[in-house]
From Swiss-Prot:
Described function: NDH shuttles electrons from NAD(P)H:plastoquinone, via FMN and iron-sulfur (Fe-S) centers, to quinones in the photosynthetic chain and possibly in a chloroplast respiratory chain. The immediate electron acceptor for the enzyme in this species is believed to be plastoquinone. Couples the redox reaction to proton translocation, and thus conserves the redox energy in a proton gradient.
GO biological process: photosynthesis, light reaction
Gene3D superfamilies per UniProt: NADH:ubiquinone/plastoquinone oxidoreductase, chain 3 (1.20.58.1610)
InterPro entries linked: NAD(P)H_OxRDtase_bac/plastid, NADH_UbQ/plastoQ_OxRdtase_su3, NDAH_ubi_oxred_su3_sf
Keyword field contains NADP: yes
Protein name (Swiss-Prot/TrEMBL): NAD(P)H-quinone oxidoreductase subunit 3, chloroplastic
Gene name as annotated: ndhC
Membrane topology category: Multi-pass membrane protein
Subunit field text: NDH is composed of at least 16 different subunits, 5 of which are encoded in the nucleus.
Domain of life where this protein originates: Eukaryota
Similarity comment: family membership: Belongs to the complex I subunit 3 family.
E.C. code: 7.1.1.-
Pfam families reported in the protein's UniProt record: Oxidored_q4 (PF00507)
Length: 120
């Protein structure tokens, strides 16, 4: 027999935590003043009128560096818990982590050879 009544508190919490933000958005939408015009569409730069065009294009190099950073950040997230429990897990997990690191090294060498890490 399943004891689903033990999850009643969870469902109540889930419903209440879902209703609070929905009600906050609805109440602010009803009570907020409606103001339309050119000031609503202008960009805001710390109270100073923007000089020139407010839209800038970023070079694709920024995104490539961000992607490489995310890859190595995820590597750290996976390897840190493994390193903390290295003595408990055994040799098979060590080999799996070694394969994981080797795949990342191959990927970084590939990105380096393709010129993704060069700033020009």
């Amino acid at each position: 027999m399943f004891l689903l009544y033990e999850y009643d508190l969870f469902w109540v919490f889930l419903i209440i935590s879902s209703l609070i933000p929905i009600l906050a958005f609805l109440i602010s939408g009803v009570l907020a003043p409606i103001s339309e015009g050119p000031e609503k569409l202008s960009s805001y730069e710390s109270g100073i009128e923007p000089m020139g065009d407010a839209w800038l294009q970023f070079r694709i190099r920024y995104y490539i560096f961000a992607l490489v950073f995310v890859v190595f950040d995820v590597e750290t997230v996976f390897l840190y818990p493994w390193a903390m429990s290295f003595d408990v897990l055994g040799v098979s997990v060590f080999i799996e982590a070694l394969v994981f690191v080797l795949i990342l090294i191959v990927g970084s060498v590939y990105a380096w050879r393709k010129g993704a890490l060069e700033w020009s």
